From Swiss-Prot:
Organism the protein comes from: Aspergillus niger (strain ATCC MYA-4892 / CBS 513.88 / FGSC A1513)
EC number(s) recorded for this UniProt protein: 3.2.1.80
Pfam family, one: Glyco_hydro_32C
Active site: D41
InterPro entries reported in the protein's UniProt record: ConA-like_dom_sf, Glyco_hydro_32, Glyco_hydro_32_AS, Glyco_hydro_32_C, Glyco_hydro_32_N, Glyco_hydro_beta-prop_sf
Domain of life, source organism: Eukaryota
Signal peptide: 1-19
SUPFAM superfamilies per the UniProt record, alphabetical: Arabinanase/levansucrase/invertase, Concanavalin A-like lectins/glucanases
Name of the featured protein: Extracellular exo-inulinase inuE
Compartmental location: Secreted
Lineage: Eukaryota, Fungi, Dikarya, Ascomycota, Pezizomycotina
Gene3D superfamilies with a match to the protein in the record: Exo-inulinase, domain 1, Glycosyl hydrolase domain, family 43
Keyword Secreted: yes
Family, per entry: Belongs to the glycosyl hydrolase 32 family.
GO molecular function terms listed in the Swiss-Prot or TrEMBL record: fructan beta-fructosidase activity; inulinase activity; sucrose alpha-glucosidase activity
Length: 537
């Protein structure tokens, strides 16, 4: 018998309220976070009938990981979000949980290949990992072992509000492929999409501890055939999870390439502790992903990092958008300390949605990201602060009081004599508390320094400095766009080829900023600061 998750019941269990105050300390004002409780990976990202759906790993019963369900939020512009009732509630929640709903994805089955559609209604189909904490015989008659991870599906006929699990045959991919069936406890995170050229559904899922991805195809989302494997390549310092596979335009033209993304935990970017996300560029023929030669490196630590900071993980892409409009969202936290960040009554936020494309930069096909929200509706038209300096002498100059939520556009010459140039953000009046975002000229690296960013007491690795490579542009200029919220900083460098994302937990009165040039003068400086208003109002 199928299991229907009714919105009214789930709503009561989840404690969803019609009116809520999003003004707590550290509450991001233009980053999505749940009203309360624990959140991690973004799941089931789907654009359908003018609505962006954001599902996410969620504990409806507390601020720590557990009872993992699929939370749900919707938006018409990737900016203003409305939290919805829990979509998939852990089976047995409130007593003995027998199945949790781990990460996955969702599609609109517009041709009703699954047969779930009725009365002309398009079925939305979610594919997720069923985690079984106890050995059991399932409604489908299948047996599973304790701690088994398998791939299952559910469908919705009301545009994602309520979901019916496919209990007659779940899980639809019960075990890892041979010869990896001993990995049944680490087989997870299906990303499913429609492949036009082959007219088939494709899903990529992780065999986590082996640093492998398994690729399957299907005609109907129910019956799956293994067609290839990918990996291990590049960074292998921790498990591989939360994979993605998608096509992007190259250099804004008609040429395209395919991209695989894979989360890694631990073993993230150099200088970080904990999780990160790497990517590969290549070709996909409907069954096999072949990486480009220059996207694979010798050894098992070098990688193409999607973000070089500590707080961008489990990045997932939207189904339902054209390839030129591709958008990804990442979890803005880190498994190293995620359970201990000082927020209440919620824990974790999502990073800014990012538009993805491929560009040839320094003769290499490179993933570029641009922050995508309805900026015209929340960002001030005129800057709060704007200055230009033909020469910015060694030392510092205070900027205006910037507040808690703003964007900084900063550019300067790469031929400067300085060793570093930076802006101190979310700083106290005496600058004993501050976060520094800037550039190291000799190393050609962006850096983000949160060692004095506020509360760093909850984890001994949190107070750190992070770096990401950025070669100056063809005019020998360095360009940074920096997005600051109440508890986060996201830096985008150049054309978006380098980003660094980090949480910070500053004092409420840390609203000051200043420019700092060390080791000499910085040339051709321009800085513009724009206010960003709350999306929760």
């Amino acid at each position: 018998m199928a299991r229907l998750l009714k919105a009214v019941t789930v709503c009561a269990l989840a404690g969803i309220a019609h009116a809520f105050n999003y003004d707590q300390p550290y509450r991001g004002q233009y980053h999505f976070s749940p009203q309360k409780n624990w959140m991690n990976d973004p799941n089931g990202l789907l654009y359908h009938n003018g609505t962006y759906h954001l599902f996410f790993q969620y504990n409806p019963g507390g601020i720590e990981w557990g009872n993992i369900s699929w939370g749900h939020a919707t938006s018409e512009d990737l900016t203003h979000w409305e939290e919805q009732p829990v979509a998939l509630l852990a089976r047995g929640y409130g007593s003995d949980v027998t199945e949790m709903y781990f990460s996955g994805s969702a599609v609109a089955d517009v041709n009703n290949t699954s047969g779930f559609g009725k009365d002309g209604k398009t079925p939305l189909v979610a594919m997720y990992t069923s985690y079984y904490p106890v050995a059991q015989t399932l409604p489908s008659g299948q047996t599973v072992q304790e701690d088994q991870q398998s791939q299952s599906i559910a469908y919705s006929l009301d545009d994602g509000l309520t979901w019916t699990t496919y209990d007659a045959a779940n899980p639809v991919i019960p075990n890892p492929p041979q010869p990896y069936q001993a990995q049944y406890q680490n087989f997870r995170d299906p990303f499913v999409f429609w492949h036009d050229e082959s007219q088939k559904w494709v899903v990529v899922t992780s065999i986590a501890e082996l640093h492998k991805l398994a690729i399957y195809t299907s005609d109907n989302l129910k019956d799956w055939k293994l067609v290839s494997e990918f990996g291990p390549y590049n960074a292998q310092g921790g498990v591989w999870e939360c994979p993605g596979l998608f096509k992007l335009p190259l250099d804004g033209g008609s040429s395209t390439k395919w991209v695989i993304t894979s989360g890694l935990n631990p073993g993230g970017p150099p200088g970080t502790v904990g999780s990160g996300t790497q990517y590969f560029v290549g070709e996909f023929d409907g069954t096999t992903f072949t990486p480009d030669a220059d996207t694979v490196y010798p050894g098992n630590s070098t990688a193409n990092w999607m973000d070089w900071g500590p707080d961008f993980y489990a990045a997932a892409g939207y189904n339902g958008l054209s390839i030129k409009d591709h958008v990804h969202i990442g979890w803005m936290n880190n498994w190293q300390y995620g359970a201990n960040i000082p927020t209440y009554p919620w824990r974790s936020a999502m990073a800014i949605p990012r538009h993805l494309a491929l560009k040839t930069i320094n003769n290499k096909t490179t993933l570029v990201q641009q922050p995508q929200e309805a900026w015209s509706s929340i960002s001030s038209k005129h800057p709060l602060y704007s200055r230009t300096y033909s020469t910015f002498s060694e030392g510092s100059t205070n900027a205006s009081t910037t507040g808690e939520t703003f964007r900084v556009d900063l550019s300067f010459s790469a031929t400067s004599k300085a060793s570093t140039f930076a802006i101190a953000l979310r700083a106290s009046a005496n600058f004993t508390e501050q976060t520094l975002a800037g550039y190291d000229f000799a190393k050609q690296q962006i850096f983000l320094d949160r060692t004095k960013s506020g509360d760093v007491s909850f984890d001994n690795t949190f107070a750190s400095v992070y770096h990401g490579p950025l070669v100056p542009d063809s005019t020998s200029m360095v360009r940074l766009s920096i997005f600051v919220d109440r508890s986060s900083v996201e830096v985008f460098g150049g054309q978006g080829e380098t980003s660094l994302t980090a949480q910070i937990f500053p004092s409420n009165d840390a609203v000051h900023a200043r420019l700092v040039s060390t080791g000499g003068a910085t040339e051709d400086v321009r800085v513009d600061v724009h206010n960003i208003t709350s999306t929760w109002n």
